[in-house]
Amino acid sequence: AAGLYWVLTSGNSNDGGIGLNSIPSNTGDKLSSGKSYYVYASEIELYPTNNEGKAWDTGDGGPDIKYHIKWLGNEIFESTVKDNSLLANWSGLQIDLKWSDLLGKTISPNEAIQAARLRYDDKGFIEIIIEDSDVAKDDAAGNLTMDLKTLRIGKNEQGYAKDTQNSVRRTVVTVLPIDSTIEDLAQFMRE
């Protein structure tokens, strides 16, 4: 486990190639037709009240934010829930280990990377469905549609106006090439 942590958090600044470490936020390269990408919401901020202008939960608790990504009409990813927060963050990396796992378990990149996987098409789009996760019934916070041609490699920040259908103030959607090295992915995802 310690070795995996070192691999995921160590950067290699002398690799001589074009690593993801050098891509600043909001200014990455355009996506390439036919190429596959990881896509996830690295940050979601909600307005202080729900779509009806009321408190998210009873008492003074904030919303329990989760999101789903749909592509080609199919749900391809569901996030973990971030409890009692108006501003939720996801790193794109998650490793759930038990003490028994520390004895020789290997983790594949597909297990560690928590993101949607899709192939770019300039006519394609994704839907991000954001909810307040509740025990009885999840409350809608917003359904956002993003044209893939508007996304860039790296972090893509977008703000939204509040109305009766939307309580999402802002999203940061991160897009990374699937063929990146695990070291580059880990470095970029932890930022």
Language-model segments: which ranges?
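Solvent-exposed coil/turn segments that connect beta secondary-structure elements
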Residues: 44, 72-74, 131-133
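Activation corresponds to long, low-complexity, non-globular regions
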Residues: 20-23, 31, 181, 185-191
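C2 and C2-like phospholipid-binding beta-sandwich domains
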Residues: 54-66, 81-83, 91, 98-103, ...
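Extended low-complexity, serine/threonine- and proline-enriched intrinsically disordered segments
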Residues: 63-75
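Hydrophobic single-pass membrane-insertion segments
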Residues: 3-19
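A short, structured loop/turn motif at beta-sheet edges
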Residues: 72-75, 118-124
